[in-house]
């Protein structure tokens, strides 16, 4: 399967799925992971409502906050992929409001 095909299929199915609003908080302790994080965020860009990145130079880390409106599966998958990166921690908080896409 060509790269990006699975995400395309997932998004096609998502058109009639329920979506949730969520906030994903990411702590980056290893700057080498930044390129991979940005690539993943670009891949899921259609679900991103907004993004804020804060370099905390005093501690040598970066803090990223992502607001999403997406199917539960897409949010969980993105969170899992980011959480598996070396030197990266992620937590996600979900709204109880669910809507049809």
Regions found by a protein language model. Give the residues of each.
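Long, contiguous binding/interaction regions
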Residues: 2-101
């Amino acid at each position: 399967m060509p790269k990006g095909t699975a995400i395309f299929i997932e998004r096609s199915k998502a058109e009639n799925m329920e979506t949730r609003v969520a906030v994903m908080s990411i702590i980056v302790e290893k700057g080498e992971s930044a390129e991979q994080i940005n690539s993943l965020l670009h891949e899921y860009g259609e679900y991103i409502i907004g993004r804020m990145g804060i370099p905390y130079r005093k501690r040598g880390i970066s803090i990223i906050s992502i607001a999403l409106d997406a199917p539960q599966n897409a949010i969980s998958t993105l969170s899992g992929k980011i959480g598996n990166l070396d030197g990266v921690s992620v937590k996600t908080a979900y709204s109880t409001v669910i809507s049809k896409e």
